[in-house]
A protein has these predicted regions:
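Substrate/ligand-engaging "lid" and interaction regions
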Residues: 1, 5-14, 19-278
C-alpha cells in the first residue's frame, strides 16, 4: 500500500469527509505499526480540536493488539491553515489558492519537519486556532460586508477602498488587543495568525464567498461580535466592529439562504429583534 510508505500523513479535507478516509488510514497505519515505523498524522482543517476526533475514530477501528501499540507509533497533530482559496463553485476543479502565512502545527515527536517550507511548529495551537477566527477571519468578514455595502463584487475591489480598509484595519487592531488581553500571548505569536504587514499577490475572491452565512458570522461568539463584547467590557475601541456588524445585517444575497432568512426576519420583526435573535 503506497500510503504506508510515508512517515508523515498530511490530510487536508473537510471534517465531514474524514468518514470516507478512515478505512484507508487504518489500513496504512496498521501496516506501519506492525513494521515498527513511527507516523505523524497532520490534520489540516480549521475545525477546533479536530485531531482528537480523528485519533479516536482511528483507534475505534484498529485491532485490539494494535490499539495497545498506537501511542508508541502514531501521533495525530492539530494544525492551523492560513490560506485563501477561491473557486467558482464547490464542484469546480479549477481554483486559485494563496498561502497568507505559514501553516502551523503542534510540535512533532516522531518526525523532523524543520526543513519543510511553508509550515512551522508552535505551541498553544488550540488557542491560536480560536484566535485566528478573530485576527484573520474577522477583518476578512469586515472587508466583505463593507465591500457589499459599497457595491463591489470582489474582495480585491474592496481592498482598494479606504472606507472598507479602515473598517477591516480597526477590526484587526481590536482582535490583536483581545488576543493579548484574554490570552496574554506575546506579539510574535499573534503575528503568526494575523494578516501579514507586507503585501502579497492577491487572488480573485468573491464577496459572496467571504460573506456567506451572515447568521453564523454575526454570532455572539464569532469573529466580529465576540471581540466587540470584550471591547465594551474593557473600554477598548470597538467602533470598527460595530460598523462591520451593522453592515453584516445589511447583507442581502438571494443565493445565500442564511442571508435570506435574516433579511426576512428583519422585514417581519425589525432590526432590534433580529439582532437579539441572531
Amino acid at each position: 500500500m503506497l500510503l504506508s510508505k510515508n512517515d508523515i500523513f498530511a490530510i487536508s479535507i473537510y471534517p465531514e469527509d474524514f468518514k470516507n478516509l478512515y478505512s484507508i488510514l487504518v489500513e496504512a497505519l496498521s501496516i506501519r505499526i506492525i513494521k515498527g515505523f513511527k507516523t505523524s498524522v497532520l490534520v489540516f482543517t480549521n475545525a477546533l480540536d479536530y485531531a482528537s476526533v480523528v485519533e479516536q475514530n482511528i483507534l475505534s477501528r484498529l485491532d485490539s493488539e494494535l490499539k495497545e501499540e498506537f501511542a508508541n507509533y502514531v501521533e495525530v497533530k492539530e494544525t492551523i491553515i492560513i490560506r485563501s482559496t477561491f473557486a467558482q463553485d464547490n464542484v469546480n476543479t479549477e481554483l486559485q489558492t494563496l498561502a497568507i502565512q505559514n501553516s502551523l502545527v503542534e510540535p512533532l515527536n516522531f518526525n523532523d519537519i524543520s526543513d519543510v517550507s511553508g509550515i512551522e511548529e508552535t505551541d498553544n495551537i488550540n488557542i491560536l486556532k480560536q484566535l485566528k477566527l478573530y485576527t484573520l477571519n474577522g477583518p476578512h468578514a469586515a472587508m466583505a460586508y463593507s465591500g457589499y455595502y459599497r457595491g463591489y463584487a470582489t474582495i480585491n475591489e474592496a481592498e482598494l477602498d479606504s472606507f472598507c480598509n479602515d473598517i477591516a484595519k480597526g477590526v484587526s487592531i481590536l482582535a490583536s488587543q483581545v488576543a493579548t488581553l484574554k490570552y496574554n500571548l506575546p506579539e510574535p505569536e499573534i503575528e503568526k495568525i494575523s494578516l501579514p504587514k507586507t503585501e502579497v499577490s492577491p487572488i480573485t475572491d468573491s464577496i459572496s464567498r467571504v460573506a456567506f452565512d451572515p447568521v453564523r458570522k454575526l454570532g455572539r461568539l464569532d469573529r466580529l461580535v465576540y471581540p466587540a463584547l470584550v471591547g465594551v467590557q474593557n473600554n477598548l475601541d470597538f467602533r470598527a466592529n460595530a460598523k462591520a456588524i451593522a453592515l453584516g445585517f445589511l447583507y442581502d444575497d438571494a443565493n445565500d439562504p442564511h442571508s435570506k432568512m435574516m433579511q426576512d426576519e428583519i422585514k417581519k420583526h425589525g432590526i432590534e429583534k433580529a439582532v437579539i435573535q441572531f
